[in-house]
């Protein structure tokens, strides 16, 4: 399989939402953070729809997300990529690994793995299943990553058992695993840095190990603070976070920029959405980012 790779000279970032619902305040934070980080470096900002899991998708959500980004004047570069149209890329890589023994079939259930202590112990690597039906596919973890550097959080240490685990790259239901798809897509699109929410810190080690297995240079990572509700839960579609209002971008952008640590000018109330974003690109600094912040309805779904 041929992957395009990336040029070291040009910054390429991306925003990659899943279409399981409309954009909410937490996903706007990820969009703005990745946008500011790219544009502050005169870089490219891509949008990719991560529609890998049809049972979790909401009909029409992908189009709604793109319309909302446009309403917020977050204009992406290039063409929107849909993971649902890239299955051949993922399967070709899996087939290549299966042919060399780098990947293998596994029939272990969640119940069986729980009995192993919660981490898969390599059972099917030693005892291959007699049949391939109803099996997942795992990658041999020959390139373990136990630490990585995050631009905000510094050195992140990954538990040894997690770092050593042969992880799933294709599920037993036939769906491709998130870790495999995002790494292959980021390599193919030339992404140089991933900016996303801190809830995705955990799989980062596995994704870096995939870069090493593919003999590619890993991207750098910046994990943004999470927007939390009053109960300490992350704002997410699963937690029924309200959709942001596409008809009132200025107020919500202002609130989101304050969340990201900006001290806004006193005359910002008269600025257009385009002017606010341009100002943000000029003044963005990673050092301004706060820790997780509680979000009230005033931030996520209310008037200015």
UniProtKB/Swiss-Prot annotation:
Pfam family, one: tRNA-synt_1c
Motif 'HIGH' region, residue range(s) on this chain: 17-27
Cofactor: binding details: Binds 1 zinc ion per subunit.
Keywords, alphabetical: Aminoacyl-tRNA synthetase, ATP-binding, Ligase, Metal-binding, Nucleotide-binding, Zinc
Signal peptide: none
GO biological process: glutamyl-tRNA aminoacylation; tRNA modification
Annotated ATP binding sites: 237
InterPro entries: Glu-Q_tRNA(Asp)_Synthase (IPR022380), Glu/Gln-tRNA-synth (IPR000924), Glu/Gln-tRNA-synth_Ib_cat-dom (IPR020058), GluQ/Sye (IPR049940), Rossmann-like_a/b/a_fold (IPR014729)
Function: Catalyzes the tRNA-independent activation of glutamate in presence of ATP and the subsequent transfer of glutamate onto a tRNA(Asp). Glutamate is transferred on the 2-amino-5-(4,5-dihydroxy-2-cyclopenten-1-yl) moiety of the queuosine in the wobble position of the QUC anticodon.
Name this protein carries in UniProt: Glutamyl-Q tRNA(Asp) synthetase
Organism per entry: Vibrio cholerae serotype O1 (strain ATCC 39315 / El Tor Inaba N16961)
Gene: gluQ
